[in-house]
Design a protein with these regions (language model features):
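Proteins that catalyze or organize thiol-disulfide redox chemistry
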Residues: 1-26, 31-56, 63-110
């Protein structure tokens, strides 16, 4: 599923790939059965290309990984969390247009 430099984030690699990242990280919490998740996926892929080198982007399948979504109280999907310095700095729940996600990301780069 992951491509375009998108990291497949799991409960096992979350701390290393997200919390210890030297760049901000956008994590897309999704599931295969979720229609809005499928709708937002192409936007996330575009952002991975556009923000390459500035922001790390990861996707986490909530059906295969339950500990991390529970830890961050992800109850609805899609949920996009932006982490910076190991902390959540933005939370977007539900389908969001690209410009809303871009605005959230731009606050945390540079």
């Amino acid at each position: 599923m992951a491509g375009n430099g998108i990291v497949e984030v799991t409960d096992a690699n979350f701390d290393q790939d997200v919390l210890k990242s030297d760049k901000p990280v956008l994590v897309d919490f999704w599931a295969t059965w979720c229609g809005p998740c499928r709708a937002i996926a192409p936007i996330v892929e575009e952002l991975a290309t556009e923000y390459q080198g500035k922001i790390k982007i990861g996707k986490m399948d909530v059906d295969s990984n339950s500990a991390t979504p529970m830890r961050y109280k992800v109850t609805g999907i899609p949920t996009l969390l932006v982490f910076k310095g190991g902390q959540v700095v933005e939370q977007l729940v539900g389908y969001k247009p690209k410009d809303a996600i871009t605005q959230a990301l731009n606050k945390h780069i540079g």
